[in-house]
């Protein structure tokens, strides 16, 4: 199989990531931070090492400003529900993922916030906005948004900035602390190359979020209230130590290879864009230059349903995703709300041969032949 669905989750994982999971489960399976014996301490060390590796990748000074969770959706819910106070005005992008849109819709429906959704949220920014929730790159067109510019605007208007880095962490350089980003959420299982069931959230020093959940943390056990210290305040319950071990190794892999990964992604994205644009009746969405996007390209073939095209590609041994990609307002803005689009997304292991195989298959589908 040719795997081109990396915007959903990355595959394959580096060998170092696979070994980290096996080693943790086979030899270091204790509960981190819950006991004083050597195996528990070793498990806690794995979590700390992963936190430090991710802090290095994000250029964050204090690793304790990074908290772990179940996935990016979990982290976005913590950020939004923890930061939004009664009466706040929240602005987000029409290209945001449902992991942002649905929590905000719930908060707005409950009367807790006022919500504005804009195709160009930076043009809508003003002193009435209390929180801006912005994707670093959207998961449909792959277009990269100007987060640094957004941070400047947010500082100007004394507005909180939440960045959804689901499609960029591990591929693009991230400097949330330096840029002035207040909150930055990411999954561990996409370009960070870790296991599914992992996510992380950077929380700016001094910003106090209301915890999303309460429970055991292994510290301050005499208290019936959540501890104030980070990261324990936001990490109730037993952590996914094997998953966090994989995330740590994935972050280290990205520390070593990120510029190379991005460079190859640019070349392959240019190849994919040029090839698709050369096929009659193929419509490509988003920026037509690779520099302005990550390695995610959505397209349609004539009037064919996106699901049919994806099924034919699957029959040809090529994994892509069709439909609305959990971003219905993005498709509405693109004019593809009825049929969605076919999305091919590159990863660190993608090759020119993979791209060429996809292009040949799409060309066959366009000609009406069996793929």
Show the residue positions of the predicted features.
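Pyridoxal 5′-phosphate
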Residues: 1-371
């Amino acid at each position: 199989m040719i795997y081109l669905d990396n915007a959903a989750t990355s595959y394959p994982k580096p060998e170092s990531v696979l070994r980290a999971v096996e080693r943790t489960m086979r030899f270091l399976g204790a509960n981190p931070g819950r006991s004083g014996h050597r195996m528990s301490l070793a498990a806690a060390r794995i979590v700390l090492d992963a936190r430090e590796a991710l802090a290095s990748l994000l250029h964050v000074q204090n690793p304790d400003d990074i908290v772990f969770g179940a996935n990016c959706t979990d982290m976005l819910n913590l950020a939004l529900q923890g930061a939004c106070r009664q009466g706040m005005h929240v602005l987000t992008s029409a290209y945001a993922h449902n992991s942002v849109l649905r929590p905000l819709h719930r908060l707005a429906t409950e009367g807790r916030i006022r919500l504005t959704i804009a195709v160009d949220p930076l043009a809508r920014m003003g002193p009435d906005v209390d929180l801006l929730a912005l994707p670093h790159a959207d998961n449909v067109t792959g277009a990269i948004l100007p987060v640094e510019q957004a941070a400047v605007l947010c500082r100007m208007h004394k507005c909180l900035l939440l960045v959804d880095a689901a499609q960029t962490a591990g591929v693009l350089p991230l400097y949330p602390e330096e840029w002035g980003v207040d909150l930055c959420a990411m999954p561990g299982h996409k370009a960070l190359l870790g296991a599914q069931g992992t996510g992380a959230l950077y929380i700016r020093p001094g910003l106090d979020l209301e915890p999303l959940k309460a429970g055991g943390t292994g510290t301050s056990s005499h208290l019936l209230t959540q501890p104030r210290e980070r990261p324990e305040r936001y990490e109730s319950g037993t952590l996914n130590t094997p998953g966090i071990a994989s995330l740590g190794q994935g972050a280290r892999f990205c520390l070593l290879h990120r510029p190379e990964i991005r460079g190859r992604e640019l070349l392959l994205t240019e190849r994919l864009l040029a090839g698709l644009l050369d096929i009659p009746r193929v419509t490509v969405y988003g920026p037509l230059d690779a520099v302005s996007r990550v390695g995610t390209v959505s397209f349609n073939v004539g009037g064919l349903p996106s699901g049919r095209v994806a099924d034919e590609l699957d029959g040809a041994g090529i994994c892509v995703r069709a439909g609305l990609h959990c971003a219905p307002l993005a498709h509405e803005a693109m004019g593809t709300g009825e049929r969605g689009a076919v999305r091919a997304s590159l990863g660190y292991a993608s090759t020119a041969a993979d791209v060429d195989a996809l292009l040949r298959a799409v060309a066959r589908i366009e000609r009406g032949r069996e793929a």
